[in-house]
């Protein structure tokens, strides 16, 4: 069985990567990896669906037990991707989406180079500011921290395979779907199945 694709989507806070991922999942048979975090839940977030919310002590115990594919500390809180389920789904041939921060994505890229790494960009920095402000969940101090981090994080776009500007969610989703479709046709991903098919054809011609 062919392994599934690991699709890693990240970008600065406010680029709308969460919304993009929701739309991708709505129209495709992807498996979405739910991250663990020590931050407090936001309004409407559900334990086990939005995140696995846990204490700092619980998270650090899981780090010691090597339970994470990647983890990072962002704005004072831990975020991490539980490892075992991701590996299980990939081995079953399921395409897996990780929506993770930039630190975490670069960790995954070190250990899983065959993944597809997609960086979500805002249409402009002004629009990025507006999106973060509209959330209404940040203090003035934390807003400034997020703005400064976003400016720095955009410099990491060159570490990714693809960059997608999220101006309109529908357009961004279509671009990502096109990227995934193209990746599935890459010869280095499908050469084994091509060779098996070729051997089958030769066998038929020789013995039938």
From Swiss-Prot:
> Which HAMAP family is this protein grouped with?
Guanylate_kinase (MF_00328)
What CDD domains does the entry give? GMPK
Protein name, entry field? Guanylate kinase
**GO cellular component terms attached to this protein's record:** cytosol
A GO term, aspect molecular function: ATP binding
| Keywords annotated in UniProt | ATP-binding, Cytoplasm, Kinase, Nucleotide-binding, Transferase
Question: Which superkingdom?
Answer: Bacteria
Q: What does this protein do?
A: Essential for recycling GMP and indirectly, cGMP.
Q: What class of enzyme is it?
A: transferase
Q: Cross-referenced InterPro entries, in alphabetical order?
A: GK/Ca_channel_bsu, Guanylate_kin-like_dom, Guanylate_kinase, Guanylate_kinase_CS, P-loop_NTPase
| Enzyme Commission identifier(s) | 2.7.4.8
């Amino acid at each position: 069985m062919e392994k599934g694709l690991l699709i890693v989507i990240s970008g600065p806070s406010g680029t709308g990567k969460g919304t993009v991922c929701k739309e991708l999942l709505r129209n495709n048979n992807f498996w979405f990896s739910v991250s663990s975090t020590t931050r407090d839940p936001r309004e409407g977030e559900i334990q086990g669906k939005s995140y696995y919310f846990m204490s700092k002590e619980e998270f650090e115990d899981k780090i010691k037990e090597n339970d994470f594919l990647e983890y990072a500390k962002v704005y004072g809180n831990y975020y991490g991707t539980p490892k075992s389920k991701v590996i299980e789904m990939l081995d079953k041939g399921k395409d897996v989406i990780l929506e993770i921060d930039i630190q975490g994505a670069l960790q995954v890229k070190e250990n899983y180079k065959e993944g597809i790494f997609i960086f979500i960009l805002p249409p402009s920095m002004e629009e990025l500011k507006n999106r973060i402000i509209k959330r209404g969940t940040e203090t003035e101090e934390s807003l400034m921290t997020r703005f400064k981090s976003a400016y720095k994080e955009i410099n990491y776009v060159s570490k990714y395979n693809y960059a997608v500007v999220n101006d309109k969610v529908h357009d961004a989703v279509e671009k990502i779907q096109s990227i995934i479709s193209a990746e599935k046709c890459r010869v280095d991903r499908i050469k084994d199945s091509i060779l098996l098919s070729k051997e089958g054809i030769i066998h038929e011609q020789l013995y039938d």
